[in-house]
Design a protein with these regions (language model features):
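Long hydrophobic alpha-helical segments typical of transmembrane helices together
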Residues: 189-221
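Residues that scaffold the ATP/ADP-binding catalytic core of kinase and kinase-like folds
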Residues: 76, 178, 207
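GST-like domain detector, emphasizing the conserved glutathione-binding G-site
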Residues: 1-134
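GST-like fold's C-terminal all-alpha helical module
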Residues: 96-196
Length: 221
């Protein structure tokens, strides 16, 4: 039987947008934790024991509780300490934040996956992966234009960052980097500036450092 960790343990993968949003909340909250970088093709047994579904992020708390949904990890960290007031955007009700995040995690994520990884969907692409990818890129444009409009005060929910921004930005980053030249040419100046400011921020830089893959035999836990 494994001893419970002294600190919360985060199983993460650097480029995963779900893991990235969890790391952002943990970083802004200042909540101490142990970072365990995962190789997705060789997931550690300890992570799978904690969360059999096998996706990152997973946060194992010192009392044994497991959080394996990225938004739950964000809310847990921010409930403990929310110095930037991400949970209290100035101009909106909580349900508006939830609706915006749901739009990102639903239809937009579906289009993002098929744009970035068209070869994963041979049954849907009809043998034309390139055309299939462009079809889903086009299908995502309405959502991106909506975000561009909503950013008229600089952030999605007003004049400062909120949970919605930090939950959604990692996915916009992934979309933009799929074809950076195309993205830069689109008529979304607010969206492009929002993403650029995020990627230039100290917070973003702090959560994007590279980690060696976690090796259980090298861990003290």
């Amino acid at each position: 039987m494994h001893a419970l960790p002294a600190l919360p343990v985060l199983y993460s993968f650097r480029r995963c947008p779900y893991a990235m949003r969890a790391r952002l909340a943990l970083a802004i909250s200042g909540e101490p934790h142990e970072h365990r970088e995962v190789v997705l093709k060789n997931k550690p047994a300890a992570m799978l024991a904690a969360s059999p579904k096998g996706t990152v992020p997973v946060l194992v708390l010192p009392d044994g509780e497991v959080l394996d949904e990225s938004l739950d990890i964000m809310r847990w960290a921010l409930a403990r300490n929310d110095p930037a007031q991400w949970l209290s955007p100035p101009e909106v009700a909580a349900h508006e934040t939830e609706a915006l995040i749901a739009g990102n995690d639903g239809d937009f994520k579906r289009h993002l996956d098929r744009y970035k990884y068209p070869n994963r969907y041979p049954d849907e692409s009809g043998g034309d992966a390139a055309g299939f990818a462009l079809q889903h890129r086009s299908a995502a444009n309405g959502w991106l234009a909506q975000l561009d409009t909503q950013l008229h005060k600089g952030w999605l929910m007003g004049d400062r960052a909120s949970l919605a921004d930090m939950a959604i930005l990692p996915f916009i980053r992934q979309f933009a980097h799929t074809d950076a030249e195309w993205f830069a040419a689109q008529p979304w100046p607010r969206l492009q500036g929002w993403l650029a400011a995020f990627e230039a921020s100290a917070l973003y830089q702090s959560v994007m450092g590279k980690h060696a893959a976690w090796q259980p035999e090298l861990s003290n836990s």
